[in-house]
């Protein structure tokens, strides 16, 4: 009853009616508002009209900001909280940067409040702070591309694990470093990479290593890692990856737990040389048989029918191509001239009496082929003994007596001169005098 007599409500009701019947059409959306939004169930008619009328009656009210489509739904109310307006991208970027800006001071404060005894936590916080200050976190999120045609150098780093857990008794560090560090120096020169041994157990003095590990110096932070080989390569992309592959392949050879391989043997020789111990003879500097060195003289063969060794030249024996095959040579006597038309003497005849020869002299080291070694087995005295026995049967000798001419043809094929395909016995012709005493009297 008091609300009906309330003058404020009466004035708002009258102003609402006058506004709805205004022909100028200043508020054309008044009748459409109830159709879009249903009235609240617990709000009184008078109060609601007064609020709506008061909102329409204020001419200085500004229009609401643009709202997204999700804000104008059936759940949106007139008297509810104002929705958040749309923001430009720059504003959203500033909102995202706020957590990063707060993250760095929080890390700094946490590092200051942390006790220095927490070594690992201090190292992690320091690394994270440096990463944010340098902006590496943004670089990690971005995609990296390699420009193979640019000559810009890049840096590659790899850590190769040393299998000390599988082979705890093998000294990998000593094998990689070598005597006085010469092995790893040569390895760096061959591969073109920077190679170093890092990690737990890389230092010889264990007490000093433990002290440096507890010191917290970032320079010795690698002592908290496992034992490994650190390889660094700097160069253009293609060359850098090729050098890294070559360096890893060479380092792999040093990670084989074998004390008898070539690497360890060379290190032992180098260590003995550095210590002043003479190098053991391994075929160097000792006279051995090879190119340019004469072989040791073999023992002199003894016995009948044993020829000189290969490559030896017996003094007085014929050289290849010097005399006609079948002729005999006496020591120190040149071969006699041959008579034209005379048949070649036969070297081997059935029933030749062989006289044992004295042992040959000591052979000389001379590189020559011993094709004519068999001619030294018989001498001229054998022929004299043979024909001296047969002189009692016949007083003279005829070339055609008891012989066949074909035998000369068969033997002539082995002539050394090679001028005639065959040697035929000439026909018997008279010689000065009826006959000779001996067919080989010219000897």
Swiss-Prot record:
Name one molecular function that GO assigns to this entry: protein-containing complex binding
- List every position bearing Phosphoserine: 18, 20, 29, 58, 113, 150, 390
Annotated region (Involved in homodimerization) at: 100-260
Residues bearing PTM Phosphotyrosine: 387, 435, 440, 443
Which SMART domains does this one have? KH
Pfam families on file? KH-I_KHDC4-BBP, Qua1, Sam68-YY
Q: What is the effect of changing residue 443 to F?
A: No effect on the nuclear localization
Q: Where is this region: Interaction with ZBTB7A?
A: 400-420
Residues of the KH domain: 171-197
Q: What outcome follows a substitution of residue 440 to F?
A: Completely blocks nuclear localization
Instruction: Recite the UniProt keywords alphabetically.
Output: Acetylation, Cell cycle, Cytoplasm, Isopeptide bond, Membrane, Methylation, mRNA processing, Nucleus, Phosphoprotein, RNA-binding, SH3-binding, Transcription, Transcription regulation, Ubl conjugation
Tissue specificity: Ubiquitously expressed in all tissue examined. Isoform 1 is expressed at lower levels in brain, skeletal muscle, and liver whereas isoform 3 is intensified in skeletal muscle and in liver.
Phosphothreonine modification sites are 33, 84, 183
N6-acetyllysine modified-residue sites: 175
| Stretches for region Disordered | 1-96, 280-316, 327-346, 411-443
Which residues fall in a compositionally biased region of kind Basic and acidic residues? 434-443
The keyword ATP-binding belongs to this UniProt entry's keyword annotation = no
Location in the cell:
Nucleus; Cytoplasm; Membrane
Q: Which residues carry this modification: Omega-N-methylarginine?
A: 282, 284, 291, 310, 315, 320, 325, 331, 340
**Reported impact of residue 381 to K:** Disrupts interaction with APC
GO biological process terms, alphabetically, are: G1/S transition of mitotic cell cycle; G2/M transition of mitotic cell cycle; mRNA processing; negative regulation of DNA-templated transcription; negative regulation of transcription by RNA polymerase II; positive regulation of RNA export from nucleus; positive regulation of translational initiation; regulation of alternative mRNA splicing, via spliceosome
Quote the subunit structure annotation.
Answer: Self-associates to form homooligomers when bound to RNA, oligomerization appears to be limited when binding to proteins; dimerization increases RNA affinity. Forms a trimeric complex in the nucleus consisting of BANP, HDAC6 and KHDRBS1/SAM68; HDAC6 keeps KHDRBS1 in a deacetylated state which inhibits the inclusion of CD44 alternate exons. The complex is disrupted by MAPK1/MAPK3-mediated phosphorylation of BANP which results in BANP export to the cytoplasm. This facilitates acetylation of KHDRBS1 and CD44 variant exon inclusion. Interacts with KHDRBS3/SLIM-2.
**Protein purpose:** Recruited and tyrosine phosphorylated by several receptor systems, for example the T-cell, leptin and insulin receptors. Once phosphorylated, functions as an adapter protein in signal transduction cascades by binding to SH2 and SH3 domain-containing proteins. Role in G2-M progression in the cell cycle. Represses CBP-dependent transcriptional activation apparently by competing with other nuclear factors for binding to CBP. Also acts as a putative regulator of mRNA stability and/or translation rates and mediates mRNA nuclear export.
Cite the domain annotation text: The KH domain is required for binding to RNA.
Give the similarity note. Answer: Belongs to the KHDRBS family.
Instruction: Provide the protein name.
Output: KH domain-containing, RNA-binding, signal transduction-associated protein 1
Name the species this protein comes from.
Answer: Homo sapiens (Human)
């Amino acid at each position: 009853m008091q609300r009906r007599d309330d003058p404020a409500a009466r004035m708002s009701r009258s102003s609402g009616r006058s506004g709805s019947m205004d022909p100028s059409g200043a508020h054309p959306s008044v009748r459409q508002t109830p159709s879009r939004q249903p009235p609240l169930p617990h709000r009184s008619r008078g109060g609601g009209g007064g609020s709506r009328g008061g909102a329409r009656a204020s001419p200085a009210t500004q229009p609401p900001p643009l709202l997204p489509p999700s804000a104008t739904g059936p759940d949106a109310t007139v008297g509810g909280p104002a929705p958040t307006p749309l923001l430009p991208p720059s504003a959203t970027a500033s909102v995202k940067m706020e957590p990063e800006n707060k993250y760095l001071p929080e890390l700094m404060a946490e590092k200051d409040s942390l006790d220095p005894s927490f070594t690992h936590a201090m190292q992690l916080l320091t690394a994270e702070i440096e990463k944010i200050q340098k902006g590496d976190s943004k670089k990690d999120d971005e995609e990296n591309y390699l420009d193979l045609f640019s000559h810009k150098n890049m840096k590659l780093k790899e850590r190769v694990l040393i299998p000390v857990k599988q082979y705890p008794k093998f000294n990998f560090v000593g094998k990689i470093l070598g005597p006085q560090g010469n092995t790893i120096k040569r390895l760096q020169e061959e591969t073109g990479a920077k190679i170093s041994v890092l990690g737990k157990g890389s230092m010889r003095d264990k007490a000093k290593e433990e002290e440096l590990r507890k010191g917290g110096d970032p320079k010795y932070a690698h002592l908290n890692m496992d034992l490994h080989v650190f390889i660094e390569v700097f160069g253009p992309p293609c060359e850098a990856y090729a050098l890294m592959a070559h360096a890893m392949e060479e380092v792999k050879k040093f990670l084989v737990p074998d004390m008898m391989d070539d690497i360890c043997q060379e290190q032992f020789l180098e260590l003995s040389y550095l210590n002043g111990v003479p190098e053991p003879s391994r075929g160097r500097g000792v006279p051995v048989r090879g190119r340019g060195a004469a072989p040791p003289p073999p023992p002199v063969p003894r016995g009948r029918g044993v020829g000189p060794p290969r490559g030896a030249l017996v003094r007085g024996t014929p050289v290849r191509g010097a005399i006609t095959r079948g002729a005999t040579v006496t020591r120190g006597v040149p071969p006699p001239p041959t008579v034209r038309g005379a048949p070649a003497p036969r070297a081997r005849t059935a029933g030749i009496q062989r006289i044992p020869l004295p042992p040959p002299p000591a052979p000389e080291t001379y590189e020559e082929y011993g094709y004519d070694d068999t001619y030294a087995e018989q001498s001229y005295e054998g022929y004299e003994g043979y024909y001296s026995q047969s002189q009692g049967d016949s007083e003279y000798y005829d070339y055609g007596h008891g012989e066949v001419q074909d035998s000369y043809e068969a033997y002539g094929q082995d002539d050394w001169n090679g001028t005639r395909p065959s040697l035929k016995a000439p026909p018997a012709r008279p010689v000065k005098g009826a006959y000779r005493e001996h067919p080989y009297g010219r000897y």
